[in-house]
Amino acid sequence: MKIIKRSGMEDTFDIKKIEAAIRKANESVIDYEKLTEEKIQEILANVEKACENMKRSPSVEEIQDMVENQIMNQRAFNVARNYITYRYKRALVRKSNSTDEQILSLLECTNEEVKQENSNKNPTVNSVQRDYMAGEVSKDITRRFLLDGDIVEAHEQGIIHFHDADYFAQHMHNCCLVNLEDMLQNGTVISETMIDRPKSFSTACNIATQAIAQIASSQYGGQSISLSHLAPFVDVSRQKFRKTVREELTATGIEPTEEMVNKIAEMRVKEEINRGVQMIQYQVITLMTTNGQAPFVTVFMYLDEVPEGQLRDDLAAVIEEVLHQRIQGVKNEKGVFITPAFPKLIYVLEEDNIREGSRYWYLTRLAAECTAKRMVPDYISEKIMKKLKQGNCYTCMGCRSFLTVYKDENDKFKFYGRFNQGVVTLNLVDVACSSGRDMNKFWELMDERLELCHRALMARHERLKGTPSDVAPILWQNGALARLKKGETIDKLLYGGYSTISLGYAGLCECTRYMKGVSHTDPDGTPFALEVMRHLNDACAKWKAEHNIDFSLYGTPLESTTYKFAKCLQKRFGIIPGVTDKNYITNSYHVHVTEEMSAFDKLKFESQFQELSPGGAISYVEVPNMQNNLDAVLSVMQYIYDNIMYAELNTKSDYCQECGYSGEIKIVNDKDGKLVWECPNCGNRDQNKMSVARRTCGYIGTQFWNQGRTQEIKERVLHL
C-alpha cells in the first residue's frame, strides 16, 4: 500500500511509523491514562484497515486524522491531546516555509500529485517544471495575501474550488475567442514585429499559429479560432497562382487558356491548403508556451459562418483537409501515427450537411470517420444553439466555456474578441452532505456557499480591474481581443456583458442521490436536480444585476479536482454508498459514469440541464470502436442535431510501443492496489512506452491522470 506525503511524494505505507508516534504520545502521560498494548494494536489494525478500504493512496494528513479519532474512541484523551499538540508544532514548522518541499519534490519528479495533475503536461520537462515552480509561488501568495481566509479555507476543504490559483498572482484572464479575422485582415503586432495582411493562405496559417502561441502565453485557459477567418486567404492564393501560372505558360511559349490556368491553379490551391492545414496541426502540437505545454486551442468549423459561393466552397475545402489530416494522425517518436490532443476540433451540424443527399453531407461523413478514429470533432447543433442563443451559433472558448449573447455599440452581435474572467466551482455534494438531508438546511447552506463563491468571483474580477493593456499587447492592443491604447486599462471590457465570469458546479448526480435517495435520472430525482440548476442561475442573475458583470453558470470539467473533492468529502463525511464511495465525483450535470443508459436517452436527458448551463457545458456518450460502423456514428450525430446543443463521442485510441498493439490499453490494479495502465497483449506497464488518449474534461488527455480520474475512466460504461 502507498501513501502520499505532504510534499506530494509517494511512499510505502509503514505501520511502524504510526505505532512510533502513538507510543511517543502514550509515554508522555501518567500510567493510569496510558493506552494498553492491546488498545494500541487495535488502533493500528483499525487505521490500517481504514486505509486499505479507501482503495487509493491516503495522505499523511488523512492517516493522522484517523489516528486521532481512534485514540479518542479509546477515551485516551490526554494521549490524543499530546498527539495533536505534536502534530500542531510540526505543522507550524512546515508553515514557516510552505513551498520549499513542494518545489523540490516537483523538480526531482517525485511529486505524484503534480505528475498526475494535468493530463496534457509532462512534469519531467524543464519548461513545465518552471511553470509549476511559478505556480507554487503564485498559490502561496494567493493563500497568504490575495484571498480572504474563509475563501482559502473553503478551497482547501473542497467546499469550493478556486480555479487556477497558480496564475492568480498575475493579472491574467481565463479563456477567449480569438478575433483572428481582425488580426489577419487589419494586421497585427507579434513580439514587437509588425505583421501585415498575409498574401497567401499558408502565410495566414503561419501567422495564426504564432498568434496562438503568444495568446496561450498571456492567459491560462483555452482559446478558439475559426477556419472561416482563414478561408478568405484561399482565394488570395488562388489569384496569385492564376497570375503566376499564366506568366509561366506564356514564358514557355504556351498560349494560356482559362481552362488551363484554372486547372493548374486549383491543383496548386489544393497543395497550398494541405500545407497550411499541416502547418497548423504540427505547429500547435510542437509549440511550447510559457506555461510549459502546447496551446489549448480549438478549431471551429462552421460552413454557414460565411456566405454561399466561392468563399463557402473554400471553407469546405479547408474543413475537408483538416479532417483528412486528423484521420491520419501524427507520428510519435517511433514513427507510428497516433491521436494528437490538439487542436481540438468542433464541427457544426446544420441543414446543409446533416442528411444524406445534402450539399455538404460528404464532410459530415468524413467527420464521423474522424470521430470514430480520433475522438474529434465534437459537435454543435446549429438548430438547437440558435434556439438557445437568440438566433446565434458560435464556438466555445477552448473546451466548453461559452460566452453569453452580447451586442456591441452598433447593435451587432459580437463573439470574437471576447473572454472569460475566471471560474470558481461549488461542490454540490458537500452542500448536500452538510445538510444532513434537511431540505431547509440544504437551501440555507446553498445560499451561504453561493455568497462565498460570489465573493471569490469578485476577487477574480478585482484582480483584473485596473490591468493595463501593456501586460499582453497581442491581446489588448493588437487585435486578438481588443485594440486598446498603450497604458489604457482593460476595465471597460470587464463590464456590460463584453466578458463573462463563471460560477461552476460539480456533483449534481451525487447531490441528488444524497438528498432524494435516487439518481437525478430517476423521475423522483430530476425535479430536485432541475430546481438546483435554476437556483444557481438565479444567483448569477442577481449578481449580474448588482455588478453589471455577466455572471454565468458553468458545468465544471473537473480533471484533477475530482479526486481532491472526493478525498475531502470522504474526510468530512466518511464513506456514504452512492455518494462518497468513489475517488471521483461526477462532472457538472452528467449522468454517473456507471449508470447504464443508451446514447440517445443520455443525450436527451442531459439536454435539459445543458440548457440551464449557459456559461458552458458539454455532454458525451461512451462508445466502442466504431470505425467499421460509421452509420451508427452518423445516427448519433443526427440525434445530436435534433436534440442537444453540444456533444461528443468518446472512444479509445491507444498504442503500445513495446509490442505494437493498437486498441484499448486497460486499467488494472497493481500489487499495492494502485490503478495502472497495462497493455493487454504484452503486459507492458511503462507509461513512457505507451500512447494513451482519453477524453477527460472536454479535451483529449495524453499524459495520464490521477487515481481519482483514472478510476472514473475505468468505470465508464458504454452507451452504444
Annotate each language-model stretch with its function:
Residues 273-277, 281, 513-514, 709-715:
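Metallocofactor- and cofactor-centric catalytic cores in central/energy metabolism, strongly enriched
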Residues 681-720:
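Long insertion/accessory domains within large nucleic-acid-processing enzymes
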Residues 501-514, 534, 695:
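Contiguous, well-ordered alpha-helical segments that form the cores/surfaces of helical PPI scaffolds
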Residues 1-110, 714-719:
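Charged, amphipathic alpha-helical regulatory modules used
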Residues 89-497, 518, 522-685, 691:
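Conserved catalytic cores of very large enzyme subunits
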Residues 14, 668, 696-699:
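Conformational switch/transducer regions in large eukaryotic molecular machines and scaffolds
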